[in-house]
């Protein structure tokens, strides 16, 4: 998938439409819908989209210049770590996100990576998603360090 997706990004940048581009687009649409249905009610699966919601509410000027997927992209490394994926897998995803030009750090969203901003975002996510288990809160807090640059 990663190799085909990287090729598709390059082809689109060149203005070329190929079956690989079609396949990646349709795969992403299908996976997004499936993930949305499967994750309904799962708090661990809500971190990346929780970041989007927090940015939309707390950092409106930054939100205005970003696409939904760009903000969610920044939360993916956190999401993967919270869900227990290996460091190798997380790094592979981060490299791919960087390859396609989506943010993987707060600073790329235009948000200062300060403790105050992190605490505002975490409070919003915990409240909005209903994450009240201290162990899960701490796991999420710890893994946000991945995107605090």
Show the residue positions of the predicted features:
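Active-site segments that bind and position negatively charged phosphate/pyrophosphate groups
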Residues: 1-95
């Amino acid at each position: 998938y990663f190799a085909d997706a990287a090729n598709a990004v390059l082809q689109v940048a060149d203005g070329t439409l190929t079956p690989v581009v079609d396949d990646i687009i349709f795969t992403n649409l299908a996976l997004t819908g499936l993930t949305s249905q499967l994750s309904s009610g799962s708090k661990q699966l809500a971190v990346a989209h929780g970041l989007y919601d927090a940015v939309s509410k707390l950092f409106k000027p930054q939100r205005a210049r970003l696409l939904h997927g760009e903000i969610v992209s920044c939360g993916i490394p956190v999401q993967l770590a919270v869900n227990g994926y290996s460091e190798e897998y997380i790094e592979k995803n981060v490299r791919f996100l960087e390859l396609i030009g989506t943010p993987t750090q707060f600073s790329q969203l235009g948000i200062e990576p300060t403790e105050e901003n992190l605490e505002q975002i975490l409070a919003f996510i915990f409240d909005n998603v209903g994450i009240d288990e201290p162990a899960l809160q701490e796991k999420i807090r710890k893994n946000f360090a991945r995107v605090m640059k």
